[in-house]
């Protein structure tokens, strides 16, 4: 309780309000354990996060009626096993075209978003791409200064690279998603599993090992233009995992 009050007072001192003005401040404590609150573990991680183990893959695969190697293959394709870029910094990919669409969806006029696109073409853009001009975290920092929540939703997160705009599947806000993804590999897995369950046709594609359908559902109908080997890569990783049993 004392930590919470101290944190609140620290933030409150940084927020200056005019008379009659109010503000909503979201405080997510540093030592929160999302997995404990969701019933995934029996003991708090103390804010250090939990790792995925083979049993997590096996249990989820059984629940979905699929082979665990299919899940592992997707992880290998999406992030090459790298859940984190650094300590408490999830692997991300910032998508500038998602930022563009989310800003308009939020109610900004097309003219205002186009003006942002002209000023920050690598951050806000109608077209996808632009992944090599600066790092995703450099882009995210600038995007947050434009609109924090839209910025978080414009990234794919963690080991399985699920987009942030699916945050409501498991979290109360984009900021809570960011906290969970940066903290915990098991949260990245849980977020991924809920995405699979809520994506129409995905579980059936996983069951039948329809690699091209998986690629379409995971990356959109134009996946062959961006990564023509995506489906073959998943199949190859799957075969490697099966052979290593």
Predicted regions and their residues:
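Cell-wall glycan-active module
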Residues: 1-245
């Amino acid at each position: 309780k004392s930590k919470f009050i101290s944190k609140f007072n620290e933030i409150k001192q940084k927020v200056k309000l005019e008379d009659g003005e109010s503000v909503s401040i979201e405080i997510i404590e540093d030592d929160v354990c999302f997995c404990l609150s969701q019933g995934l573990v029996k003991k708090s991680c103390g804010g250090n996060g939990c790792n995925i183990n083979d049993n997590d893959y096996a249990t989820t695969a059984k629940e979905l009626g699929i082979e665990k190697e299919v899940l592992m293959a997707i992880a290998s394709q999406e992030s090459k096993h790298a859940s984190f870029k650094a300590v408490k910094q999830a692997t991300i990919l910032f998508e500038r075209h998602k930022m563009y669409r989310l800003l308009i969806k939020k109610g900004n006029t097309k003219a205002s978003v186009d003006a942002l696109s002209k000023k920050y073409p690598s951050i806000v853009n109608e077209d996808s791409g632009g992944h090599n001009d600066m790092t995703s975290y450099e882009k995210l920092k600038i995007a947050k200064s434009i609109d924090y929540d839209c910025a978080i939703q414009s990234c794919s997160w963690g080991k399985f690279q699920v987009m942030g705009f699916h945050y409501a599947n498991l979290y109360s806000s984009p900021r809570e998603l960011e906290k969970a993804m940066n903290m915990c590999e098991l949260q990245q897995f849980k977020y991924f599993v809920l995405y699979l369950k809520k994506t129409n046709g995905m579980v059936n594609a996983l069951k039948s090992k329809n690699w091209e359908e998986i690629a379409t559902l995971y990356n959109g109908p134009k996946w062959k233009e961006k990564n023509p080997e995506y489906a073959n890569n998943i199949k190859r990783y799957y075969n490697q995992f099966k052979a290593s049993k």
